[in-house]
A protein has these predicted regions:
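Bacterial N-terminal signal peptides
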Residues: 15-25
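A detector of low-complexity, intrinsically disordered, Ser/Thr/Gly/Pro/Ala-rich segments
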Residues: 1, 5, 23, 27-28, ...
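Gly/Ser/Thr/Pro-rich low-complexity, intrinsically disordered segments
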Residues: 27-389
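Bacterial N-terminal signal peptides that target proteins for export
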Residues: 2-17
Length: 389
């Protein structure tokens, strides 16, 4: 039987609030939150560290990695398609199969063009489905054993033509004239492209098919070939879009032809059920990273980190002189080290910085209200296993 969750606002401790300022001095905690916000299990804690002198307001969720009652899930801006929404609305729209949401933070940086607004900059895996390809920045994922990982991830997605030659492809993104991009229904009702050649693909006999997963080779049959863009999308089809400049350098296919789509990444994320991009890395092997001067400005920040025992979701309020001025990257990295993180990475910050826990947004967004984000990382209590009858 599940225990009721009770979150306790912990007394601020030097070990939790010690962060390097530009002179790398320790924060001195002069105030701490005292409001009860819910209930706790021993494996889950939420705290708000407040320092009135700097000032700083830092929101932290800590979860025990050894506890097997939780997992992570990512969200999409529009629930099932790319887009933008505030974190609290993304949590509400999370599929029931993810489990009961306990905490969430905003996720990756994102595409801002109108047609593909909310497309994550780097890799996202949602319930095992790959939403976007990695772009080489720092990304986070969990392996099947519940072990967190962080490194730069690279795409080797490609289409393999009938003659055996291969062409690199993007996924659910802006297609330039010299590019090839694969689209799934995550993009929306159509590809939203202009010009080029587009192949509507359906499942070939005995081939794995949708939802699209990393580490597969899909054999697809061309259902239709179109000499214009904006091809329709459905849950059982994909569209391969070829830009007009590239079209003259790749084979022209007719309906009934087959091709292959390889969804490889480096490192291999085929076993990951959840992944989200961001960056840069903040802490590696227990040591804070170093950055050039332009990253030494204080802003609201969102980060995640872990050690062998605990996983942390962290948000630092900023741009509010009476509440919290924010942190530089060195200050944030030092704070995460003081928490005990051996690995940690940055996520989108600024006005996007949001931490939701136990039913409500706990931080003070810098723009006075939540700003829409492309995705979020959500901590959920697993759904109980169905009992046998």
């Amino acid at each position: 039987m599940n225990m009721k969750l009770r979150a306790e606002v912990l007394r601020s401790r030097v070990g939790w609030v010690c962060a390097a300022l530009l002179a790398f001095t320790c924060l001195r905690t002069t105030a701490s939150s005292t409001n009860e916000v819910g209930k706790q299990d021993r494996w889950f804690y939420y705290t708000n560290d407040v320092n009135d002198e700097v000032p700083l307001s830092i929101h932290v969720v800590r979860v025990e990695l050894s506890h097997h009652d939780f997992e992570f899930c990512t969200s999409l801006g529009k629930g099932t398609t790319l887009g933008m929404a505030v974190v609290s609305d993304q949590v509400k729209a999370l599929p029931a199969e993810c489990g009961q949401p306990l905490a969430a933070i905003n996720g990756d940086f994102y595409e801002k063009s109108e047609k593909y607004l909310g497309r994550p900059r780097d890799v996202e895996i949602h319930l095992g489905e790959v939403i976007s390809t990695p772009a080489g920045h720092t990304s986070f994922w969990m392996d099947p054993d519940g072990v967190p990982h962080m490194t730069n991830v690279y795409s080797r997605f490609r289409v393999i033509w009938p003659d055996g030659k291969a062409t690199p492809i993007g996924l659910n993104q802006q297609r330039e004239d010299d590019m090839a991009v694969l689209y799934t229904a995550v993009t929306g009702s159509s590809t939203r492209t202009a010009g080029g050649t587009e192949y509507i693909l359906e499942q070939s006999t005995n081939s794995p098919w949708l939802p699209l997963k990393i580490g597969q080779v899909y054999t697809a049959k061309v259902r239709d070939a179109r000499a214009s863009g904006d091809a329709p999308l459905s849950r059982d089809t994909m569209v391969l879009s070829i830009g007009p400049v590239l079209a003259g350098r790749v084979p022209a296919l007719r309906p009934g032809a087959t091709l292959q789509v390889a969804t490889e990444t480096v490192p291999d994320l085929s076993a990951a059920r959840v992944a989200i991009g961001g960056g840069p890395a903040l802490v590696q092997d227990g040591k804070p990273m170093q950055w050039p001067g332009f990253l030494h400005m204080r802003h609201p920040r969102t980060a995640l980190g872990w050690n062998k025992d605990y996983f942390y979701m962290v948000e630092v309020d900023g741009r509010q002189s009476n509440l919290s001025v924010g942190m530089t990257f060195p200050e944030l990295a030092a704070y995460l080290v003081k928490l005990g993180c051996t690995q940690a990475m940055n996520l989108d910050g600024g006005g996007s910085a949001t931490l939701w826990a136990l039913g409500a947004v706990r931080n003070s967004p810098s723009e006075g209200e939540e700003r829409p984000s492309a995705n979020a990382l959500v901590l959920v209590r697993k759904k109980p296993a169905a009992s046998a009858h």
